[in-house]
Every structure is written in structure tokens, then in C-alpha cells.
Regions:
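Peripheral, non-catalytic segments that deliver or gate enzyme domains
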Residues: 1-216
């Protein structure tokens, strides 16, 4: 609402374990505590989902994650638990249009992607299944496409999925497929078919390509 913001407060050991809401122009002692992590081995933080519809609170230690969410347009803040923490299970929640997307290592050592309708978080479906000896990376959302990455045998690959057809294909920047040790996506405008891909190999200096998904 441009009138307030959230911040985390450190405990005596300088670990963020509380999240407050501050309204600009009001005294700090009137700030509202919206979340507190009771477990001293966990820390917490807050972020905005890709579509900016939800704030997501993430509480974690080095091996376990638990996340909460609440609508960004609400005045009555009541964080909702997405999935109760399970030892050694990490997950990351994001939202895009009518879905929550979840990157998780539960029953998938190298991660997988699940999704569910925003209004039915208990009905999860597999979006990107786990692959043997392949690390499944995160997602980048455009209005008509979903871009994702994966890594196997030290080679990074980038895939584009058409949201309407659900068809997916790999982006190939170069025939030099023996090594793509670093690939990144940089995107601000979601209403586009163009993405920027950072690419380099053992014998090719780093470059940034603009890639049009429609014209290739």
C-alpha cells in the first residue's frame, strides 16, 4: 500500500527471528509483530512472490524449511502455514497467476517442482518430476512462458514451457554443449517473449544473449 513495510528483528545472537510491520509516520513502538520463530536454531525472513500477490515468510535452519504466506493486499495479516516443517526437507514457495509453485527435495534428493491451486494448497501435483543425477533448478515466470534450469554432468540447461500448450523445449545457445558452467536469467518485463541468458564455457568468455522464445 506504499504506506507500510515489513522488517525482521535480530535476537541477542544477531539472528532474525521476528518479523514486524511498520506504518510510515508512526512510532516504532507501535509496530505489529506478525511472525515469531520460537525455535532458536531457526531464522526467518520475508519476501514478495513473483506475481506480488503474496508475502512469503520463510523459516529455516541449514537443512529444514517451513514457509507461510498471506495476501499482499490484506490489512488483516494472518500468515498461513503452507507445509509443516519436516527434518531435512527444504522447499521454496512462489506464486504465479492461479498457482503456487514449490521447489522441494522431499522424496527427491536433487529437487522437483510441485504446484497447486492457490485456493487448494492440499492438492499438490507434480509439475517437474525428479530426474536421476539431475539437479532441478527454480522457475522464471513470463505471461505466456515458464523458464527453468537443470544441471547434470556439470552441464547447465535451460528449458522453456509454453503455458497454453504445456509443451517444453530446451534453449540451445551454442553447439558447445560440453560445458555451460554458469547460466542465469535476468528478466523484469513479464509481458514479453524475450529473455536474457548469461552463458560461458571453459574456452569461451562470458556473454549475455537476448533470446526470443517465439523466433528462436
Amino acid at each position: 500500500d506504499s504506506k507500510s513495510f515489513f522488517y525482521s528483528k535480530l535476537d541477542k545472537f544477531h539472528r532474525p527471528r521476528q518479523i514486524y510491520k511498520h506504518v510510515v509516520g508512526t512510532p516504532i513502538d507501535s509496530d505489529k509483530l506478525i511472525f515469531e520463530e520460537k525455535d532458536e536454531t531457526f531464522t526467518c525472513g520475508i519476501s514478495l512472490s513473483t506475481d506480488e500477490k503474496f508475502f512469503i515468510i520463510s523459516s529455516s535452519d541449514h537443512i529444514t524449511v517451513e514457509e507461510y504466506f498471506f495476501p499482499s493486499d490484506t490489512k488483516s495479516i494472518k500468515p498461513v502455514l503452507f507445509q509443516k516443517r519436516k527434518k531435512n526437507v527444504r522447499y521454496s514457495l512462489d506464486s504465479w497467476k492461479e498457482y503456487f509453485y514449490i521447489q522441494t527435495n522431499e522424496d527427491a534428493r536433487d529437487y522437483k517442482i510441485l504446484r497447486c491451486k492457490i485456493n487448494d494448497i492440499n492438492k499438490l501435483e507434480e509439475f517437474i518430476p525428479p530426474k536421476k543425477e539431475t539437479v532441478i533448478g527454480g522457475l522464471e515466470f513470463l505471461d505466456n512462458f515458464i523458464v527453468r534450469s537443470e544441471k547434470s554432468d556439470a552441464i547447465h540447461k535451460i528449458f522453456v514451457r509454453d503455458i497454453k500448450t504445456n509443451q517444453e523445449e530446451e534453449i540451445k545457445i551454442s553447439e558447445e554443449a560440453i560445458g555451460i558452467p554458469g547460466a542465469s536469467l535476468m528478466q523484469k518485463d513479464r509481458n514479453t517473449s524475450k529473455i536474457r541468458v548469461g552463458w560461458e564455457s571453459m574456452k569461451t568468455p562470458g556473454k549475455v544473449y537476448e533470446y526470443d522464445i517465439l523466433t528462436k
